[in-house]
Regions:
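Flavin-dependent oxidoreductases
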Residues: 20, 180-182, 189-289
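Dinucleotide-binding Rossmann-like beta1-alpha1 core, especially the glycine-rich loop
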Residues: 53-128, 139, 256-257, 266, ...
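Short beta-strand to alpha-helix junction loop
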Residues: 62-73, 97-107, 143-163, 315-326, ...
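Helix-loop-beta segment of a Rossmann-like dinucleotide-binding subdomain
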Residues: 88-98, 110, 123, 130-168, ...
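C-terminal catalytic lobe of FAD-dependent flavoproteins
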Residues: 306-404
């Protein structure tokens, strides 16, 4: 017999955005019954727990984008949350360096974008780099971002989950669900139960577009996962103490291989951005799911017809970086303070689940929020989603009529 359960709000997905949404709803509506449901055994198993831990400053994003709207404020609020809860944040700052003369104009454009976004940022001459990060190297100019920092994603997600339950929120794990239409209302169907809610929030990360399609939303979108692999080594004297990033390649929709310092005195290099089939394909065939072949085929077929990204070139250039030596050589263009002979171990990889628009033939780069019937769908909460999570969630709660 199928049991019907009733809630005020049900959130699908116990990542940092799903939990932040639950906290925001309980902050504004403390008497409401709110459930967060997830197919895993604990919060933040995938994107939220496997991201780089970098609190981005907010200068990469187009000034009219949701990413620009929330990243700077999210940086401040996530740091405040960490400080309030005695969680470590390493205020490393970041330099963005030029690898050749062609990067200089793009660097200056990046700086202007940061100014437009109200970010604390400096454009400096190469002779000042030794003062800020002597291990880095640049051509002509570089950007200094003092507010970029590093936190521990797993510790932060755990503390947020504790806050949600302390406020009266409920979790249900080990629960795979699907959305079903019934009498102009969407219900959540699980194994032996059905959930009814005044409002549902689909915050299922890589699976959000799949769930949305079950109730007729977002058929123009497919998910294309990109594998972000890293290598790590013990931090040694002479390694960069700041994060060191390249100027992003305009034909590659990602930030490029960079160096990141961890809270456990390690330095890591990466990530790659290699297109894969599986939404949980963290190793070559680990997590491969043949059911996801269709979306991979549709996404890559669409992008092959597009001038927006060279998907074949991207796959080739990123695939070679899955091997240790080419990845380290790429990072050494940013800093000479890396030794190929150091012990470089694999660091837990992540998946960046990008949405491809089949109609416009582009990889969607901004957050996408759609609502229909009694469901709000968060379809593209990619980087800097972790940094932006608190103000982004507040904006969703305050601006989606279904949640008010």
């Amino acid at each position: 017999m199928t049991e019907l359960e009733n809630y005020d709000y049900v959130i699908i997905g116990a990542g940092i955005i799903g939990i932040s949404l639950g906290i925001e709803l309980l902050t504004q509506k403390p008497t409401k019954k709110i459930l967060i449901i997830d197919k895993e055994t604990r919060p933040g198993v995938h994107a939220s727990g496997r991201n780089s831990g970098v609190l981005h400053a907010g200068f990469y994003y187009s000034p009219d984008s949701l990413k620009a709207k929330f990243c700077k404020q999210g940086n401040l609020e996530l740091k405040k949350f960490c400080n309030t809860n005695n969680l470590e944040v390493k205020e490393t700052g970041k330099v963005v360096v030029c690898q050749d003369k062609n990067d200089v104009t793009r660097l200056m454009n990046l700086f202007e974008r940061g100014i437009a976004n109200g970010v604390e940022i400096e454009l400096l001459e190469s002779n000042e780099l030794s003062r800020i990060e002597p291990a880095a190297q640049t051509v002509d100019k570089f950007i200094w971002s003092p507010t970029t920092a590093v936190g521990n994603p797993k510790e932060i997600i755990k503390k947020l989950a504790d806050k949600f339950t302390d406020m009266g929120g409920l979790f249900r794990f080990n629960s795979r669900v699907k959305l079903i239409n019934k009498n102009n209302e969407v219900l959540i169907e699980g194994d032996g139960y059905i959930l009814s809610a005044t409002s549902i929030i689909n915050s299922a990360g890589a699976y959000a577009s799949e769930l949305a399609k079950q109730v007729g939303v977002g058929h123009e979108y497919v998910c294309l996962p990109f594998l972000g692999a890293y290598r790590k080594s013990e931090f040694v004297a002479g390694n960069p103490k700041r994060l060191v990033y390249p100027v992003p390649n305009p034909i590659n929709p990602f930030l490029g291989v960079h160096t990141t310092n961890t809270l456990s005195d390690e330095i890591k290099i990466g990530p790659t951005a290699f297109p894969v089939i599986g939404k949980e394909q963290y190793k070559f065939l680990d997590g491969f799911n043949a059911k996801e072949l269709r979306d991979f085929y549709l996404a890559t077929k669409t992008l092959l017809k597009s001038d927006s990204v060279n998907i074949l070139g991207l796959a080739k250039s990123e695939g070679i970086k899955l091997f240790k030596r080419p990845l380290i050589k790429k990072a050494k263009r940013l800093t000479n303070a890396l030794d190929l002979n150091q012990k470089w171990e694999n660091y837990p990889a992540g998946i960046r689940a990008q949405i491809v628009n089949l109609d416009t033939k582009v990889i969607e780069m901004d957050y996408i929020v759609r609502s229909d019937k009694n469901v709000v769908h968060i379809l593209n909460a990619v980087s800097p989603g972790w940094t932006s999570s608190i103000p982004f969630s507040r904006w969703i709660v305050e601006n989606q009529p279904l949640l008010n």
